[in-house]
Amino acid sequence: MQLTSDQLTESKPVHPLDLGSLRAALQALANALDIVSSPEFSAVDLRWRDTLVAGVVQHFESTFELCWKMLKRQLEREVPSPSELDGPSYRELFRLGYQRGLIPAVEPWFEFRELRNITAHTYSREKADKVAAGAHALLAAAKALLSAIESRNHV
């Protein structure tokens, strides 16, 4: 069977990315940050504070992971050859996201990756506090990324 030129250039319909998990992660991180940023937080028992900060760290990690996965999925839709994205490091992925206008700068994302890595293997209150301090910046950057992806998916 011979294909016509129209059939060769037809592409499958592209459905919008399902961004529900990223939206949920952003909301969970925002909720956790609201709690640990509240005036009442300092009056809470130390055990509760440690547990709540650990929750912020967990939400930071899951939000970061979802961000780079959604960034990769969006880039797979945009680059001429999606197989180009099979091997690049996370740094190259964020650079491509910057070049494509999905993120305004790469440096914050490199910092978020470092923060995510410091809690991956060992845990300490100091490390948790450091990650929690960076969570506000991640929340803002992740919201901007979500907005950029939504605009390209007509959501």
Predicted regions and their residues:
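Solvent-exposed interaction patches of small proteins and small membrane subunits
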Residues: 1-155
